[in-house]
Amino acid sequence: MINRRYALLLIALGTLLLVSCVVSLGFGPARVPLDVVWRILLHKLFGFGVPDWNPGQEHIVWLIRVPRMLLGALVGAGLALIGAVLQAVTRNPLADPHLLGVTSGATLGAVIVVLHVGEIIGLLTLPIAAFIGALLSMLVVLMIASRHGRLDSDRLLLCGVAVSFVMMAIANLLLFMGDHRASSAVMFWMLGGLGLARWELLAVPTASVLFGLILLLGMARPLNALMAGEQTAVTLGLNARTVRLRVFLIASLMTGVLVSISGSIGFVGLMVPHIARRLVGAEHRRLLPVCVLLGSVFLVWVDVAARTMIAPEDLPIGVATAAIGGLFFIGLMRRR
């Protein structure tokens, strides 16, 4: 009975995600009727129908909104997945992808390149610079946290927060002293957004989310044991340090990839795992797929709100998720 309910929940969430993805393509500064969206998708994916729509509508839907929608679904899924496993290994309900220092490292890399190097390899310049910054930040956190051979969760989080503050201070100083026109460009990226979405940029985030999900699902039992406490994990024969290190590396690499293309989008990895646990409990083989689906649906619709609320301008997604996340946790605290 429980397995049947879980299967029905996955089917319902999967259906909701598919419907959300299609319906969201009609929203934006230029409205495209849903029947036109549907015909464009059928024609592009399966060759059905005769293109009797406006070429401008096809350009908007297929080249702008579909990549953006797919990137939003991937980023939402990835951040929710990372948040769930970090909350498990740290046993901290407030842990999220941005506590590891990776986001601030990506920000610093982006700031340095935009202000002092320029777009030497075109559209890929900013994502590559951000990813390199994220990797360097991850290595610094790891070196400091494991200096004395220990890698407990408190030390990991504290090192991540400390490195994050230092890197953000350097990034803000460079922005303050740099060219203001370039600063405004990188500021929008720092606030989070899906404006960089292009078909050619989707392969790497897709691979990172899929491989991350497979690897972390394979670690579901160790994650369950760590949630019960380090002593329980040791009793079951697990090496808590090794499990924690593997999760940290997977989470950091995924965060680096996602942040490099979407900027800093907060609260998804913090809020979605809490909602998922209320639906299916804390067993990670059941929890992680639900987190992925919920995170995707959530960010697809937040992006719709971001591009329609102050149209024709784009509201940074990080602003929208921060507002929703803050209200969510205020409501949660009031209920308790």
Language-model segments: residues:
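Alpha-helical transmembrane segments in inner-membrane proteins
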Residues: 1-336
